[in-house]
Amino acid sequence: FFADFTGSGTPADFTYLEPLRAPDLTWTLGLTYEWEAGPGLAYVRASAHHIGEHHTSQLNSPTTFNKEQTLVDLSMNYELNNTVFAFFAKNITEEDGFTVGYDVFAGAAWTYAMARKPRTWGISITQTF
């Protein structure tokens, strides 16, 4: 396709660029096991989300290229009436890819990316009204 990505005022041929954030392969596998526990419902969840290699910036900068990665999340939950208490761990394998990439002034100034969150864990309470 032809576009003026560089701000020169003249469209150029950018057909060689791969689409950003468009891996050839993605998949997700999730498992949930639940059981009645007292007056509520307890359940555990595990999921794995695979993202194939892909570019995160418009101009396919090699500094913002993501190699393939598999994100693994786990949680233990207890649901009582309309409230869910959860202990969770996200990205437990510490995958360190980028979520998005930017080419400032079409890469003439610099290119940068936003890093994926590292391993995170916590407790949450969710109330549904």
Predicted features, each with a name:
Residues 1-58, 124-128:
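Gram-negative outer-membrane beta-barrel transporters
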Residues 67-68, 78:
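Residue-level recognition of alpha-helix initiation/capping sites
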Residues 8-11, 61-62, 102-105:
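Short, charged/polar low-complexity linear motifs in solvent-exposed/disordered segments
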Residues 49-57, 78-129:
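C-terminal beta-signal and adjacent terminal beta-strands/loops
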Residues 38-42, 61-62, 79-85:
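Generic structural signal for short, solvent-exposed loop/turn connectors between secondary structure elements
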Residues 16-20, 60-65, 110-114:
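Outer-membrane beta-barrel domain signature
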Residues 23-27, 68-72, 117-121:
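Residues that define the transmembrane beta-barrel architecture of outer-membrane proteins
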